[in-house]
Amino acid sequence: MKDFAAIDFETANSERSSVCSVGIVIVRNGEIVDSYYFLIKPEPEYYSYWNTQVHGLTMEDTMNARVFPEVWAEIAPKIEGLPLVAHNSPFDESCLKAAFQMYQMDYPDYQFFC
């Protein structure tokens, strides 16, 4: 696979919809061509101790961040047509689907690989 987008979500709490950050690396022809990192205001908006221990993010970090639909509107054109690759793809795919559902957005049929 020479063209793909590597993606990684972090969540604020045990709710998969509570994405608080996303990192994306775009690879074309086997070369990294772009990378992005966005803080996201989570929904529901609270942080659990254990999640913060994993990623170090707190409510203060995302207090003024954009909500998921605004961030995804910027990301979607950058990953259009690319398979999504994640270290723990079941988790990351479930986060993406949950965020789409939380905001009543139509979920495109993204193809995930691990």
For each feature predicted by the language model, list its residue ranges.
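Conserved non-catalytic scaffold segment of RNase H-like nuclease domains
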Residues: M1-D109
